[in-house]
Amino acid sequence: MSESTGIPQGSPAVGAAGSAPAAPGVGGTECSGAAVGSARIAVKKAQLRSSPRPKKLEKLGVYSSCKAEGACKCNGWKSQNPPPTPPPPTPPRAEQPTAVSLMEPCRSCSHALGDHVTHLENVSEEEMNRLLGIVLDVEYLYTCVHKEEDPDTKQVYFSLFKLLRKCILQMGRPVVEALESPPFEKPSIEQGVNNFVQYKFSHLPSKERQTIVELAKMFLNQINYWQLETPSQKRQRAPDDDVAGYKVNYTRWLCYCNVPQFCDSLPRYEATQIFGRIFLRSVFTIMRKQLLEQARQEKDKLPPEKRTLILTHFPKFLSMLEEEVYSHNSPIWSENFMIGLSGGQIPTVVSAPPVNRSLYYSSSPAPVELAGGGSVSPARKTASVLEPNPGGEKRKPAEPLSHEDSKRPRVVGDIPMELINEVMSTITDPTAMLGPETSLLSAHSARDEAARLEERRGVIEFHVIGNSLNQKPNKKILMWLVGLQNVFSHQLPRMPKEYITRLVFDPKHKTLSLIKDGRVIGGICFRMFPTQGFTEIVFCAVTSNEQVKGYGTHLMNHLKEYHIKHEILNFLTYADEYAIGYFKKQGFSKDIKVPKSKYVGYIKDYEGATLMGCELNPCIPYTEFSVIIKKQKEIIKKLIERKQAQIRKVYPGLSCFKEGVRQIAIESIPGIRETGWKPLGKSKELKDPDQLYSTLKNILTQVKSHPNAWPFMEPVKKNEAPGYYQVIRFPMDLKTMSERLKSRYYTTRKLFMADMQRIFTNCREYNPPESEYYKCANLLEKFFYTKIKEAGLIDK
């Protein structure tokens, strides 16, 4: 199970200089020992994880409570021969000390080491290595607690220390709870700066606009590595500012962005993705001042081609951005900001290990290799503050190129973006659309359309609520919970009222409530099981006089988006005979994707009900899904109309059928080729499934054996390429293709070729042209099409 802890507000920053954090508050300036300290942690973890299993058990035993008979209260095994304090320096390449025997008695309780680690007997190496990583994070935070002088900072260190210590004892996963879960503001800083570039510079020529994009990337990256001043320093520097609000964001930044950079057992987020305008306002002034000051100090180190960018364009960029940051009515901070049709967007800023580098941007940075293997992301970045993209990460996203500058090959049959934009401008412009007024809902509108419009007008609201034993009850929430109890009891008459009351008011259960005119008219009661990877839906109902209005669909869509935000992508529920139809419409089926071992013993079984499941796609915005589908249909319809308008010639109807002909070849229809239709070569599509399978298997084997196939063998790992799955909406790899081929998914060559092409297209979309991945994609693509032609699946 996941462990969580509340973090006190206004806690000072955490550093990572040397073996313990540096004093917080030096905004933006990093200590020279930062990278060394983080690298040291990574090396220690690598060494410990490579130790023999007895040594690992000894290390974990120190943090494991005694399980000997007699209810021993010892909370950790202690050696009879404790190491000296401080320990002697370890000589280079020294052999690891021999692990003690499992029969070695504890200095505290006299029970054997084996009595402390009985719960680890059947634990996998992967899980044990995860726990060992937490152990080293605990030891590091312990040092921080003792060396830190600031009481607020010490308190945060101690809170995180206790959280991780508890996770080791209970073999759980740490969850930091500071006020609420990220993101804390919408739109985010990243989106706001992206909007700013579109709002102010979309009219510029491509090359000039690209300069602005580079400056924006530099600025966003700097925020992700900026060291905030402590609340006390903030109070001294700007006593009139909202220090209380600053403390809240400061604590969030500390827990979600700063500490996880060197304690990687904690979840980590980028500041630009979870904070927004309020956070940026609190740091912008001092940040701008120090950025420009360092730029002037390092101007002699800049190459001539970068001096104008850094010394001239960057100050102007910051001045213009400052106006929008502090303006009360700037459109860039609107969630409904419409991105202009021209210009590229700023890609997601991906965090990466820092390297010592000069002020200017290098397009091909070198990675930092560590003795223990891999690379680390320290708490404080030693690179220059104006560095736009610290190097060393795998598969970093390329800078956006405008359509006229892009030389990347397009997917076969892809529609030009200019045409899409032109069609979009038509279907979104009421003056350009002909036909009757559409103020009323059409007969073919989506089920949730009416509910969506009511939500926009403020007629209905959605709130996730639940009972709490830790906080004073909120009167409004308690009233809503009572309302939910009444709705569920009335709509589910066969369910005992006491049972409904117990679950609705159970602190482990939450309810997504639908509020209209201040009262509850529906809701979905659920319980989340994060460690098992699913959520159980317990009750789902809308009051009878409010049904058939799309509320049920919109309610479920909100629940799906809530779970995507919390990274739980599976729903399970027991549906009775009356609810099966509803759940089927919401994407549920009897084909359960969650392994049975994950949910047996966790969810409630109901007699006469059917277990149904739903797997969520994190790429789908469910509350707007029907709108997106509708718009896609309109785009396709307009594209067809344009194609029809281009075909001016009108042919007479076919008369051959009147003469007794039963069927004709499609290609013999007059004018069919002019519409863009292409005949499929007779030898191209293999009709024998076994022959097709054999041919595709042979091609895939040759592709996987190619020397340039190594980057595409398995799915991209999130920790190797942060943000990859936000940039690439439809990932594909050779391992997935092998599994699909084995399951006979590829019933036609087109499906096979589409997946293979997606691998190459995704790679070129995410990586810069000069990268090794980009080159591998081009070479492997050429090899693939050679083999496809040799197999006779396409024309040579």
Swiss-Prot record:
Pfam families found in the cross-reference section: Acetyltransf_1, Bromodomain, PCAF_N
Protein name: Histone acetyltransferase KAT2B
Pro residues bias: start-end ranges: 81-94
Region (Disordered): 1-32, 77-97, 371-408
Binding residues annotated for acetyl-CoA, in chain numbering: 540-542, 547-553, 578-581
Function: Functions as a histone acetyltransferase (HAT) to promote transcriptional activation. Has significant histone acetyltransferase activity with core histones (H3 and H4), and also with nucleosome core particles. Has a a strong preference for acetylation of H3 at 'Lys-9' (H3K9ac). Also acetylates non-histone proteins. Involved in heart and limb development by mediating acetylation of tbx5. Also acetylates spermidine. Together with kat2a, required for growth and differentiation of craniofacial cartilage and bone by regulating acetylation of histone H3 at 'Lys-9' (H3K9ac).
BP-aspect Gene Ontology terms: bone morphogenesis; chromatin remodeling; epigenetic regulation of gene expression; heart development; internal peptidyl-lysine acetylation; limb development; negative regulation of centriole replication; negative regulation of rRNA processing
Gene from which this protein is expressed: kat2b
Residues forming the catalytic site: 536 (proton donor/acceptor)
PANTHER family: GH11602P, HISTONE ACETYLTRANSFERASE KAT2B
Catalytic activity field: L-lysyl-[histone] + acetyl-CoA = N(6)-acetyl-L-lysyl-[histone] + CoA + H(+); L-lysyl-[protein] + acetyl-CoA = N(6)-acetyl-L-lysyl-[protein] + CoA + H(+); spermidine + acetyl-CoA = N(8)-acetylspermidine + CoA + H(+)
Similarity annotation: Belongs to the acetyltransferase family. GCN5 subfamily.
Broadest EC class assigned to this enzyme: transferase
Annotated compartments: Nucleus; Cytoplasm, Cytoskeleton, Microtubule organizing center, Centrosome
Domain N-acetyltransferase: 469-617
Effect of loss of the gene: Craniofacial cartilage and bone defects, characterized by shortening and hypoplastic nature of the cartilage elements and disruption of the posterior ceratobranchial cartilages. Morpholino knockdown of kat2a and kat2b leads to impaired heart and limb development. Abnormal fin development is also observed.
Residue stretches making up the Bromo domain: 687-791
UniProt keyword annotation of Methyltransferase present: no
Disulphide bridges, residue numbers: none
Biased composition (Low complexity): 10-24
